[in-house]
Amino acid sequence: MLMALCALLASCGNNEKNQKTDAAAPVLTAVSPEPGATGVLVSTSSVVFSYDQNIKISLADQSRISITPEVTINSVNAYNNTITVSISGLEYATTYTVEVPEGAVNGFKSSQKAAAVARTSFTTENAPVDPGTDERLSDVAWDLAAALGLGWNMGNHMDAFNGTTPSETVWGNAKCTQATFTKLKQAGFKSVRIPVTWLDKIGPAPGYKIDEAWLDRVAEIVGYAEAAGLYAIVNTHHDECNNDGHWLNILAASVNPDTNESIKAEIKAVWTQIADRFKDKGEWLILESFNEIQDGGWGNSAAFRANPSVQCNVLNQWNQAFVDAVRATGGNNATRWLGVPTYAANPGFVDYFVMPSDPAGKMMLAFHCYDPYDFTIGDAQYSDWGHTGKAGNKANGSDEEYFKALFNKFTRNYVNKGIPVYIGEFGCSMRNKSDSRSWAFYKYYLEYVVKAAKTYGLPAFLWDNGAPGYGKECHGYINHGTGDYMGDSKEVVDIMTNAMNNASPAYTLETVYAKAPKN
């Protein structure tokens, strides 16, 4: 008996010695929208949970994720250290709670515990109001919006590049001419945005001298706009790093202060030269700091989602460096309007945006709008859009009420307070006119968006890449070399210029809505 007891005790001791300790469970580090966030756009399409390590979640556990009050969960995607819950159908002024239940999220270590429950709540924005019902403290932004009106983006042109070398014609467009801009004015456009990529047209440190011939050509094109009586915007465009090694690398700057200081020095040097070249031009010329600064993930990378304020704060610093450089050149640059974008030019990240300090007090906020993506520029290319569109033929969300809410947020928080806001890019892939249904919804979308922009005091710049035909990436309206209409674009351009320029009290956003294509 004694021997048996000793054997049993020895066996228990060995079991305790051989027992493995479970690895620590994955720990939640961040959620977007942030817990307790208010004013969240009803267009918000995802809730992202970030953990301290790479994680996984089974299909069965994905189905256990809940959102209360109930809305549609379109998909759940685990990638690296994040879980993205794609949603649609949020309502105004509603508090939602999203829960990933205990045990659903697991790591990849052996003998590892599952994660604890992850829960977050946020409240959506209030329902949109007509812009006139908010107190308008200043007419400055409204007046500038009227002056800029409907603008034209000369896309895939001076922003085109091969490798690291910018070239006006490398992406297939002919060199622009004075006729291009003269005919734009005749078509009803009031302004042009001239995206410019600089890349290796910038010399080495410390001078960063810009190639004279390239700057001369930019100045010549700006002169075309001046001669045509158009407002013009000039920027730095594809210098941003989109996983391609370009110099405006916000990810590198966000993790290395020395890199950030080096990039800011180059920003100041580049913009000092550009601004100096144009310091005698009138207020019809606007300088825009950047295009769509982001880390290659368009706001969805693990690095960004872990703490969006980190990269957004870097962009805020870069925008300030731009303003300081331009103002220091003097002349008309001391007081001209300057434009600065949100992160990725995405309106959804405006809460992280800080307007640069400006002694002249003449700053403009820029964002881009290609919503809904699956209708405008994505692969799906749905045929329908809006309240009369047929389910299954249109993208989820981003109907008429979405645009009213989105635009009104900028009107209420900026425009009515005297801070101009402009939609630096918008548009939709051309549709085939022979498909009468698709053509009708295409025209309706562009008319509604432009009329909404007009209603809420936002000038809007149509993206035109010069690509003929119809379908994805076909955004050709005006021949860049001649200014002539492309294909069936005149019908669409006339609709948009009328939406922006027609001030008749009988032509309103409501009358456009009422004329939506019949299902």
Locate each region found by the language model.
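C-terminal motif of bacterial Sec signal peptides marking the signal peptidase cleavage site
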Residues: L8-S11
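Acidic, Ser/Thr/Gly/Pro-rich low-complexity segments and short DxT(G/T)-type signature motifs
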Residues: Q19-A37, Y92, E102-P128
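Short, surface-exposed alpha-helix to beta-strand junction/turn motifs within ectodomains of secreted
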Residues: S43-V76, G103-N106
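N-terminal carbohydrate-binding accessory modules
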Residues: A127-S191
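Acidic/histidine-rich helix-loop elements
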Residues: M154-C176, P204-I210, D374-Y402
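An active-site-proximal structural segment forming one wall of the substrate-binding cleft
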Residues: G172-S191, K209-T236, N242-S289, N316-G330
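Active-site region of glycoside hydrolase catalytic domains
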Residues: E261-D399, A405-C428, T455-L458
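Aromatic-rich peripheral "rim/lid" segments of glycoside hydrolase catalytic domains that contact
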Residues: K433-N519
